Amino acid sequence: MIIKQDKLSTFYPLVSIIIPVYNGANYMREAIDSALAQTYKNIEVIVVNDGSKDSGETEAIALSYGDKIRYFHKENGGCGSALNYGIKNMKGKYFSWLSHDDLYYPNKVEHQINILNKLNNKNTIIYGGYELVDKNGKFLYHIRPDSVLTTDKLNISLLPLLRGLIHGCSLLIPVKYFHEVDMFDETLPSTQDYDLWFKIFRVASIYFDKLILIKSRFHSEQGSKKISAHNEECNALWSSFLQKLTEEEMIKMEGSAYLFLTRTANFLSSTPYQEAYALANNMAKQILRDAKVSVIIPVYNRINWTIQSIESVLNQTHENFEVIVINDGSTEDISELIKFCKKDKRIQYFHKKNEGPASARNLGIKKSSGKYIAFLDSDDLFFHNKLELQLKFMEENNFIFSHTSYQRIDEEGKYLESINSGSFSGNVFPKIIQTCPIAMPTVMGTLALFQENLFPENIRSGEDCCLWISISSRNLLGGISKELSKVRIRGDNTTFMNPNKYSQGLINITSYVLNNAYLAKFAPFTINLLLTAVTQLKILESKNELELLKNEDESELLENEDKSESLENEDKSESLENEDKSESLENEDKSESLENEKKEKNVEKNNNYFTQYNYPIIKQKVRKYYVKKLLENKKKEENNYFISYLKIKLKSYYFIAKILILLTIASLKEDGVRATISKIKRWFKKHRRF
């Protein structure tokens, strides 16, 4: 598509088209004709004869154009020398290179000037792809940079150049860069173009346009094919690029220096430039070796296990790490631990008063000097290659936050089971609110991330999940399916084995979410946590009571519950208008009960508390406990439409339980929560509960 020149525009700069030529009688006339045929008329065409030795054939063709072109003849000095000669003699504000064997489409200059006219920065370099043709000008195929990189990346200075996507004749360059940066290096026979583009692109803005505007001829007479030292020159050029680039430039191009180097190595692996490939590969490996990881271990008693945990870090295949041990006011004799820490200079030991693991980890973060932070509880263990594999994974995928799968072991260190939590990855928010499978010793993140996101110290249980939720709300989560840590199960002292501690953690997480202005918008996802907490507290705390309840006749339980509900919520003076309506409502209730039980079966696989306990038992227990325990916190409840709705509109614990269970089921579906709320409102209105 041709972009028509805006006749009202005052942007109409002179463009100099420079054609360097050496023995170019075969193709030069076509090149000059394509330059003179440009629809943009404010141009000058400069032909520089670089000392051709073809009995004057090249010069004769050039002179035949008379004053239509500006013709110069000089001694042979190479392509770079001829281009420099043309630049020194050009009058235009923009430079456009045309090889003597290539061709411009008629709208090449006009199209690029129109693009510049729309850009605020008139010093931007415009470029695009090209069409490859054979010696007779017959079409071969298109070279499209946008098939290799996204448009955003094609506009990042240097990146398209370092992926071999820049064709010099597609460029439109402000002449100022030749005066302010450099000219072509005349000592380079075949890489003088990329050498100069590298220098200019480091300071200039570039803009990719997808329209094909040039034809590049592929034939056996091209100069670069005749230079025996071409590969050696290219190896040296690409190696120099790698050595000159700063870390900031690499990060700008690919997000991290490691990612840039690995992708550059991958690009170079398919070229003859194997020395440059080896350099890029070695530089990438060195990035990993140089990446320091700070491993933070909070300690409270259990010194023997703590020493085992530290040893699992000292045995890592990745050697650049520091171990930061935070003694959180242990009451046991810690002399052996202190003695052990002094044996290795990579271990730093700090003592503080007991304020909980969140406070201890935060102190560790403040004392860390690594690029990355990994957490390890004092009774857990790392696999020997944990840091190496997770670090490489994060660098390769440009993650700043990740976790892995893990194994559970008993107090003796014996294997119990594998937990495939690493499959939980990507954009996990907001579902992470209702299901957070991340184990502390599997986590690794950047120091910068944790400096900005500390653990909530006012929470003693569930503080880790609170932080993971907060971080995941703004960042992708990297997940590794391979098991790289061992989590020790310590009976009742382990959170998920202790109903009271587990429930308190869930309540803490819920409170944290509802008291955060942003997270509170996703309040329906806390329903799963609340119902699980109540179930744990009111059912798991008494195995005998549970067994007794399981043996009760379900229909009798429901009948008693209905009677209790009737006594509690219905006005004694109110009676139904007729028996038929009563039967209708009763049938509707039974139908809805069957529907809910059907929904319950569909989610049993994802909710272990449903598979373990009868549905009516959960309702009976929840109704007696929920409001008292879980709605005590009045802070910012106006941000939670769900809790406000319950407290204002409802008077019955039974109905609260019913809503909780329906919303728990609905929350497993992406669009189910609001629809269920509407359904419940209609149900209550029909039953005169407002």
Swiss-Prot record:
The EC code for this enzyme is 2.4.-.-
* Molecular functions per Gene Ontology: hexosyltransferase activity
Which residue ranges are recorded for the region named Disordered?
A: 553-601
Please provide the Gene Ontology terms (biological process) for this protein.
biosynthetic process
Protein name, per record: Uncharacterized glycosyltransferase RBE_0706
Entries under SUPFAM superfamilies matching the protein: Nucleotide-diphospho-sugar transferases (SSF53448)
Which of UniProt's keywords are assigned here?
Glycosyltransferase, Transferase
Return the similarity comment. Belongs to the glycosyltransferase 2 family.
Which enzyme class?
Answer: transferase
Question: Basic and acidic residues bias located where?
Answer: 560-601
InterPro entries, sorted: Glyco_trans_2-like, Nucleotide-diphossugar_trans
